[in-house]
Amino acid sequence: MSKDCTIQDVFHRFYPSFESTHDISPTQRKAAYHIMNCKTGAFGVNVSVCEDCGCISVHYNSCRDRCCPMCQEFPKEKWVDARREDILDAPYFHVVFTVPEELNPIIYSNQKFLYAALYHAASDTLSELAADSKYLGTDIGYICILHTWGSTMNFHPHIHAIVLGGGLDVKNHWKDNGKDFFLPIKVISKTFRGKYMAELKQLWENDRLEFHGSAAPYKNYYAFKELLNTCYAKEWIPYCKKPFDGAESVIRYLGKYTHRIAISNYRIKDMTESTVTFSAKDYKNQGLWKEITISGEEFIRRFLMHVPPKRFVRIRHYGLLSSRNKKKKITLCRNILGCKKYISKLKDMDAPAIIRLLYNKDICKCSSCGGKIIPLPTEQHFIKPKPHMLC
């Protein structure tokens, strides 16, 4: 038995055999290499010396891969903090867009196109319905984030949208619906279904889709038509969570969803020579946590399913929050509402200062004597220090 193991440990033990027996994409292989070599010295080191006692500190560089569980916290904190300047004292809602599980094989075989289609369908649904005077009649703002996993690391692509519950009408007047969401869920469902299925059908008619693995049967014309009919007939079930309790809760909530990966280290409970045990929420049992044991290679397979395509943008901003609009329109909204501007806490701070603020840890302070440590030039030839000199 192996306690307190990490995802890096799991990859070290099981990935080599998995790679030799499975078809792995270059992007997945790169992510696996990064995870296995993060903070091992493979990506270089930072060497510092204490000005007072001469104690030498060696810090191994991280891989900075967005799929690495050890590399998400710092960029998440910086990203979320930067969003403070876009937040208004206004209603916000969390809307989740899901698709029928029958589409999963097709989506997995065509991630670049069909992930993009999820964003297109979700964003067009929100923008068009919000602009309809029957509902709100405004230009709203929202952030969309793609997640591809369920709690057990199964393939479950869905979009999380953090939606501003009000917006600007054609006369640049602010309108909102108070604490009630301005769009009926059934209308969202039908509109989203129509838009996503239309784009899927268009890709199919233009011969842009590929059919690999469990999607292979849908190469057949009649099988694909039956799949379309099945999904059209189903009621798609997006849902809207209750409004956030103030701007700060929106900021905290963003942190929960923006830089997540399929599974974090704290959920790994045990590892043996052949299996991995991890915790997962059981949504059939009121969301209670349970432990699941699977083979090590199955763990690797599930994890790698969620490596996004190369250069794929997972966090996207729309409407009032788009980069084109937000500087002018968010300022206008803030003036109309009379709400204060939330200032970034970390803006213009260097990494040591951010770490000191967030984690109460001074990386410029010698852990041995408390003196000031300074970096050695990276180009300087470094002779391995004797053990007694290391902090």
Describe the residue ranges of each PLM region.
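Beta->alpha loop/short-helix hinge microenvironment recognizer with preference
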Residues: 1-391
